[in-house]
Every structure is written in structure tokens, then in C-alpha cells.
């Protein structure tokens, strides 16, 4: 089945559900899959691509790669972080280049001989996907090994509030807010951040 055919089948299934014929969503198309199965496959593929995007973002952070970091955003993407709100992929890349220079000044003398000192992790990913738009929330934390004993410590944690958009078949962040629990002004409020 072509992409158009799959999309058409999903639209038909949704229309039939809205119209009240729920059993129609479970009928098989000529390719052998029920329309509900096609919708589930589309969701699974979108979710996998979004989780891959999140992983690429984390690797870019840890290896301080400003261009790879910025490439996870749409051209008009917005980064809302502790340093302020930055709009546009080019401005995000410039901002991250500045962060990289600031962090480089803090590195110890043996830093060039060592791998990246931070490792960022993401978990508890909650996503709502609606066509070519999605919203997401997830926990993040970072482990730092830059202590005198090089023993790892959790040095930061929080959650992301994300808006995503599919551009030319690929998911990208259109807006990412980084909530940081070690900073009172960026900490989560009393309400559950999940939907």
C-alpha cells in the first residue's frame, strides 16, 4: 500500500469511527491489514522517529555539537531554556556555540584527553501525535563525572515540554522548553505535568 493509500485508509477509518460505524475500522483492506492496525503502525513509526530525535538531541548535547543540536529543530523552532528564549534554527546554533565556549572555559586541564564529561538521559516519554503535529513531555537527568574522584553524580534533572512538527517526512522540535528542577525559576509547579 502506498503512503497515500495508508493515509487515505486512516482518514476513512477515522471518518467511519466519527460517523458511528466502529466495526468498519476493524475490517481488512485489500492488503490484509485492518484500518485500525494501519493507524497503530503509523503511530508506532512516528513514536519511534520522535524517540530517535530525542536521542540525537541528547548525543548532540553531550558531545557539545551545536550544529547537530540545532538540526533537531525546525527552521522556525524555539528553544526555551534557562538562558532565555531563542527563535530560529540559526539562532539556536549560535546560542549553543556560545554555550560551548562558556563550558570550555570551565573544563579542567585534562578535558581534551577525556570523553564528554556529561551524559544526559531521557525517560518517561509521553507523546500525543495528531497527524504532522505532536506534543510531548519527558523526564531528563544528567550525570557528571567531573568530580575530583571522577565518581558520577546526578548534577541536574527536570522535564521537557515539547511541540513537534513533521517536516518533509521527518519529526523535528518546533518548540522545546527545558524545565530544570535545580533552578527554582525553571522547576515544575505543583500540578502533574502529564496530561
Regions found by a protein language model. Name each.
Residues 1-9:
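Bacterial N-terminal signal peptides that target proteins for export
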Residues 66-140:
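A solvent-exposed, acidic/Ser-Thr-rich amphipathic alpha-helical stretch
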Residues 45, 84-87, 152:
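A structural signal for alpha-helical segments
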Residues 25-38, 109-195:
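A beta-strand edge to alpha-helix "cap/lid" segment located at domain peripheries
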Residues 11, 22-25:
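Cleavable N-terminal signal peptides
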Residues 24-59, 63, 67, 71-75:
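Short, low-complexity N-terminal intrinsically disordered segments enriched in polar/charged residues
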Residues 8-17:
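Bacterial N-terminal signal peptides
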